Amino acid sequence: MSGWPVLPALLLAVAMSSFHSATSRDEERNRLLMREKMMQVGGQLVLQEEEERANGRLQALKEAEMQEAKRTGIFPPSLHFFQAKGLMEKSAVFNILKKMPKGAALHVHDFGMVSMDWLVKNATYRPYCYFCLTPKGATQFKFAHPPPPTPKQEECSEWVLLEKFRKGLPNVTEFDNSLLRTFTLMTENPQETYANQDMVWKKFKTIFFAISGLVNYAPVFRDFIFLGLEEFYQDQVLYLELRAMLYPVYELNGMVHSREWSVRTYEEVARTFAKTHPGFIGIKLIYSDHRSKDVSLIKESVQRAMELRAKFPQMVAGFDLVGREDTGHSLYDYKEALMIPASRGVKLPYFFHAGETDWQGTSADRNLLDALILNSTRIGHGFALSKHPAVWADAWRKDIPLEVCPISNQVLKLVSDLRNHPAAVLMATGYPMVISSDDPAAFGAKGLSYDFYEAFMGLGGLTADLRTLKQLAMNSIRYSALSETEKKVAMETWEERWHRFVAELTRGPK
């Protein structure tokens, strides 16, 4: 019987061991969670007391939306943007993000920055606006007085005065709606309308062909720039860097302006805009050309970019190549042209689109290698970066950020559910990035808020919080082409607005 008292002691020892084991497991788990939280974008930031309260409210709303999405099976980032947009606009989180000071938009194409609705309702209603149809059914516009000469039959039908054409229509609204459909990718059934990438890119290209005759008309051009700045300013964006191809801008009498005139016009409009918009920081242009062109033409473009930057150092930030990577020339194809500045000892910053593809091992995929080798200041999209561990490591070491455009990547069919976007992994590891919107008008969006929502809810999941948003906004200034002095002023302006935003978020709805 003397052995019996030993049993409770053994049981107690086992229980204590299990308790310590469970405790150590919990501690280890918490340490892992904390390490991951510290690693993610914004994880190193320490929030002030008021920011913590604001974060608590934001995360409560976010969690409620996610719980509702789990219950209903309807989660906007998992849906195509055209079907998710209306749901997003009802979201409490989205409406908070609309008020959030976002800093800068660093990946926006000039022709895609203004609501297409304005082009239809304003630009096409101006006097002397003509249109014609190409043999393939594409619409082309031109302002002219006297009327433009009859085009060649293989190029376009006869020019028709739009004002006169509308007068003969039984339903002008339906015609205007058809124009709007021509100017955007928006459709009720995107999966059916755009069954593959070729189809969506084909329509995408026709949009810019259609609107070019409107936007490049000098009076529209000025108003277009101003309105683009207005739309982003209303969305709490104070600075933009625009990819601009600087197509010839023309007057009513047919006179065509130089690229220098266009750059000066951007400069003048931005200066005028700043006078009536407190806190607006400005714009810079990234001169761009199309990657479908021959090497000899890209050599000329690089030369032109150097000249424009020398003439407008405060306005022209650098050079990029635009257009679909999968079907265009690779950066490697253009290496001879792209080495010209370095061979002449001229600094021409590059802001290359690279890796906007889901075809691994192709020349488009390997654009990431050449963007790194050519010291691209930032990388546009970089969708394929996670498939290139060496490039990923070296680009991170060089502090080369990605310009992530979630909606663009989804609409152009690189990814369907944004929770599966490769930038979700990059965001979790803390890779430097900014959020931008590419061609928001073509997607039926405005400004940056829609992309921020997709990034915050879809890419970041529940772990992304106010720190993530704050870091992304700060990154947009840090990785901009502004000078160090300009960045300091921009950051101060942003911080002032950020504090107001946090105070309002803490107070909650009135």
From Swiss-Prot:
Question: Per UniProt, what is one GO molecular function of this protein?
Answer: heparin binding
Cofactor: bound how, per the entry note? Answer: Binds 1 zinc ion per subunit.
Q: Where are the transmembrane segments?
A: none
Question: How does this protein assemble?
Answer: Homodimer. Interacts with adenosine receptors. Binds heparin.
Query: What Gene Ontology terms for biological process does this UniProt record contain?
Result: adenosine catabolic process; inosine biosynthetic process
Primary subcellular site in the record, as a coarse category: secreted
- Which residue ranges does the record annotate as region Dimerization? 25-95
Name of this chain's protein: Adenosine deaminase 2
Corresponding gene?
ADA2
Q: What positions does UniProt annotate as the active site of this protein?
A: 356 (proton donor), 381 (proton acceptor)
Q: State the needed cofactors, names only.
A: Zn(2+)
Tell me where it resides.
Secreted
* A GO cellular component annotation in the UniProt record: extracellular space
Positions of glycan attachment? 122, 171, 375
> Which InterPro entries does this UniProt record tie to the protein?
A_deaminase_dom (IPR001365), A_deaminase_N (IPR013659), ADGF (IPR006331), Ado/ade_deaminase (IPR006330), Metal_Hydrolase (IPR032466)
Q: Which reaction does it catalyse?
A: adenosine + H2O + H(+) = inosine + NH4(+)
Per the UniProt entry, the signal peptide is 1-24
Residues that coordinate or bind substrate: 110, 201-208, 290, 323, 439
Query: What intrachain disulfides are recorded?
Result: 132-156
